[in-house]
């Protein structure tokens, strides 16, 4: 290629770097991709695009780009670093460890590399230990937990919770959380136990309508961004007898108020079981919670048992909600097999499989993503797969649906309508992780089943960083 191609490509890389510095990750990816199209022999173009993919949680793409950079220049240490980060994000700790070792060996004075290497070694040891002691059917986390015997001191300055949830308790809980206070662990245990029992009895696919004089609001990922959740309620109304909410998974992890969101949504679910609906997301799972902050947050704010009971409640959550026989709402997306139908979801016994694993219907419902190309493709995340507009069309036509509504991915405008209107993504965590300049969105659905998209901006929150409770330093790099 002519030197002019390299010069033009380098100029595009500079524009990509500028967009990256402004937290405009999709724009950065576009510029790096244009640079590669001009000149595909420069490893930094691929390595920089890998870093932008990491910010977009496209970890599979990041691994592929970092690997390409190393094919072009095996001495390009930065690519090992980025591939290690991406592998850590999708829990491929052993692959990450190999790359962290390379970085630490090549840069012996790099203190950060030594810390990340040590953290990754701990993750590998923990994974191997947990696998060694794993039992097929563990006892309930509520076994031997005598909630009634837990005493609440007279000094507790909040509203007391008796045997049933009240609006008064919820109102007080919201104010406590806003002011950096907790509720008593007894009340937290009560809430989780009550909701675990409620959702366990619900079908794997909950089927609901929207009655005259009422509305339903569908929210996407909230990821521990408690103050942005309150902004949704401020703008759109709090849950009530006439106003139901459906939260489409990923209530927890990343944001540092995950226990607050989970307890608030659970409290509303207990108060109005038919007015709050909760789908499971890929972050309502043990593997993700142990890496992305929720386990550490439970331990820091309550205790280890609190995480275990939450984990058990997460495994009981429904996987999908069908609205008016027109919209299938699920966290990730569609399936590897065109023959999969709504009846297959109905028949899925989620209670026999507490965690989604690496394959199968539950994993696909929690992890897959849409793509613009027809057919199916490998996952940009490195987990699951991607499905094209033809896949969505066939599924909707076969099952009599107007569209699927999913979450699972940042959208810069808060939502996106794709696949000829048949695939809708809604994401409700604006300024995601305090680094992405995205808006949040939610969808209001009335009795006529028309979709009304609402967009909102992030609001200020106390100075606690995302991932503050993650139990290793690696994830702070994401």
From Swiss-Prot:
TPR repeats lie at residues 9-42, 43-76, 78-110. It is found in: Nucleus. Pfam families: Metallophos, PPP5. Its EC number is 3.1.3.16. SMART domains: PP2Ac, TPR. GO terms for cellular component: nucleus. Gene3D superfamilies: 3.60.21.10, Tetratricopeptide repeat domain (1.25.40.10). The active site is at residue 283. Its cofactor is Mg(2+); Mn(2+). Keywords: Hydrolase, Manganese, Metal-binding, Nucleus, Protein phosphatase, Repeat, TPR repeat. It catalyses: O-phospho-L-seryl-[protein] + H2O = L-seryl-[protein] + phosphate; O-phospho-L-threonyl-[protein] + H2O = L-threonyl-[protein] + phosphate. The keyword Manganese applies. One of its GO terms (molecular function) is metal ion binding. Residues 151-463 are annotated as: Catalytic. InterPro entries: Calcineurin-like_PHP_ApaH, Metallo-depent_PP-like, PP5_C, PPP_dom, PPP_phosphatase, Ser/Thr-sp_prot-phosphatase, TPR-like_helical_dom_sf, TPR_rpt. Binds 2 Mg(2+) or Mn(2+) cations per subunit. Mn(2+) 1 binds at residues 221, 223, 250. Mn(2+) 2 binds at residues 250, 282, 331, 408. Belongs to the PPP phosphatase family. PP-5 (PP-T) subfamily. Protein phosphatase that specifically binds to and dephosphorylates the molecular chaperone Hsp90. Dephosphorylation positively regulates the Hsp90 chaperone machinery. The TPR repeats mediate protein-protein interactions with substrate proteins, but also autoinhibit PPT phosphatase activity. This is Serine/threonine-protein phosphatase T. It comes from Aspergillus oryzae (strain ATCC 42149 / RIB 40). The gene is ppt1.
């Amino acid at each position: 290629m002519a030197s002019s191609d390299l010069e033009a490509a380098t100029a595009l890389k500079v524009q990509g770097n500028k967009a990256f510095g402004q937290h405009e990750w999709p724009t950065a990816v576009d510029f790096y991709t244009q640079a590669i199209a001009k000149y595909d022999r420069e490893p930094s173009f691929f390595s920089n695009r890998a870093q932008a993919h990491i910010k977009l949680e496209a970890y599979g793409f990041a691994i592929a780009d970092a690997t390409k950079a190393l094919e072009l220049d095996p001495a390009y240490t930065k690519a090992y670093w980025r591939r290690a980060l991406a592998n850590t994000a999708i829990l491929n700790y052993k692959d990450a460890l190999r790359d962290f070792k390379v970085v630490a060996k090549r840069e012996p004075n790099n203190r950060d590399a030594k810390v990340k290497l040590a953290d990754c070694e701990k993750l590998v040891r923990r994974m191997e230990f947990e696998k060694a002691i794993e039992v097929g059917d563990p006892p309930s986390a509520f076994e031997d937990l005598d909630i009634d015997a837990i005493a609440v001191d007279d000094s507790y300055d909040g509203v007391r919770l008796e045997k049933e949830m009240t609006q008064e308790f919820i109102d007080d809980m919201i104010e406590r959380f806003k002011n950096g206070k907790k509720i008593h662990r007894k009340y937290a245990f009560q809430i989780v136990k009550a909701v675990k029992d409620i959702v366990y009895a619900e079908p794997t696919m909950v089927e609901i309508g929207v009655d005259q004089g009422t509305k339903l609001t569908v929210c996407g990922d909230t990821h521990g961004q408690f103050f942005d959740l309150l902004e949704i309620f401020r703008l759109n109304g709090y849950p009530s007898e006439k106003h139901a909410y459906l939260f489409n998974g990923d209530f927890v992890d990343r944001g540092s108020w995950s226990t607050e969101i989970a307890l608030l949504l659970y409290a509303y679910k207990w108060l109005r079981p038919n007015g709050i609906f909760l789908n499971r997301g890929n972050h309502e799972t043990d593997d993700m919670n142990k890496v992305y902050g929720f386990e550490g947050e439970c331990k820091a704010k309550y205790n280890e048992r609190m995480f275990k009971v939450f984990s058990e409640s997460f495994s009981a959550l429904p996987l999908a909600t069908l609205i008016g026989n027109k919209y299938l709402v699920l966290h990730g997306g569609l399936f590897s097999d065109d023959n999969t139908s709504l009846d297959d979801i109905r028949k899925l016994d989620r209670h026999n499989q507490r965690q989604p694993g690496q394959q199968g219907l539950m994993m696909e419902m929690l992890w897959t993503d849409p793509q613009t190309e027809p057919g199916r493709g490998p996952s940009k995340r490195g987990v699951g797969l991607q499905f094209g507009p033809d896949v969505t069309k066939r599924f909707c036509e076969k099952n009599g649906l107007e569209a699927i509504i999913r979450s699972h991915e940042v959208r810069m405008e808060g939502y996106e309508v794709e696949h000829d209107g048949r695939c809708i993504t809604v994401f409700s965590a604006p300024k995601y992780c305090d680094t992405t300049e995205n808006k949040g969105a939610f969808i209001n659905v009335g009795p006529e089943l028309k979709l009304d998209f609402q967009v909102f901006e992030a609001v200020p929150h106390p100075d606690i960083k995302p991932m503050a409770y993650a139990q290793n330093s690696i994830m702070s790099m994401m």
